[in-house]
A protein has these predicted regions:
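Helicase C-terminal subdomain and adjacent C-terminal extension
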Residues: 12-19, 123-194
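ASCE P-loop NTPase helicase motor core
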Residues: 1-7
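Feature representing long, continuous alpha-helical segments
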Residues: 39-43, 64, 68, 72, ...
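Conserved helicase/translocase motor-coupling segment
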Residues: 7-85, 97
Length: 194
């Protein structure tokens, strides 16, 4: 960590977790890579880059297509802006990145924005498929990917999602360890770690 160690307990002005539940018209919050979630994620990222330039930032998308849509949304929102600096002055090697769950290993940043990219299937149906997190082969592939994603932040994790994890009944999640761990992690972040 650049020869600096943040010891626990550390008094900071911001909690280490923040949950942004994206709401809106169903067509904007449903399906894979919901439009409203992409917009909200990039708004938060740009706000962080502008107002906290000392922090390095990354977005982790829970799918390849969702990562592509987030990159497009970032380009759209910054437009012709040339003054947006996307790395801390003292750490130019920690440039802002958007990665997906399967290619984030090895990258760390001060702040990680996790964008789940999975909205409800219909007005009355909760999504049960979460891409690579659904694969519990003998090596617990999905759980390992989730573990890598949630441990990339040095200071803070902010989750952006159309998923309200408290609407899920643990008994209806099936036997998949990764899927259950994902919903439990979302609950943990939404409660700010309590």
């Amino acid at each position: 960590y650049n020869k600096k160690l943040i010891t626990a307990p550390s008094i900071t002005s911001l909690p280490p977790f923040k949950y942004h539940l994206v709401t809106g018209e169903f067509k904007e919050i449903s399906g894979v890579s919901p439009e409203a979630e992409c917009r909200k994620t990039i708004e938060l990222v740009i706000n962080n880059l502008r107002n906290k330039p000392e922090e390095s930032v990354a977005v982790i998308a829970f799918g390849i297509e969702h990562a592509r849509r987030l990159k497009n949304e970032f380009s759209k929102q910054i437009g012709e802006e040339n003054d947006l600096v996307d790395y801390p002055e003292d750490r130019p090697e920690e440039k802002f990145i958007i990665r997906h769950l399967e290619n984030i290993q090895g990258d760390e940043r001060d702040v990680i924005f996790l964008s789940t990219g999975y909205g409800p299937k219909s007005q009355n149906s909760l999504r049960q498929f979460f891409g690579p997190l659904n694969y519990d082969n003998p090596k617990l592939f999905g759980l390992r990917r989730l573990n890598v994603a949630i441990t990339r932040a040095r200071k803070r994790v902010e989750v952006i999602s159309t998923i309200d994890p408290y609407k899920y009944d643990d008994n209806q999640l099936g036997q998949q360890v990764s899927k259950k761990a994902f919903i439990q992690y979302l609950r943990y972040v939404k409660s700010e770690g309590s």
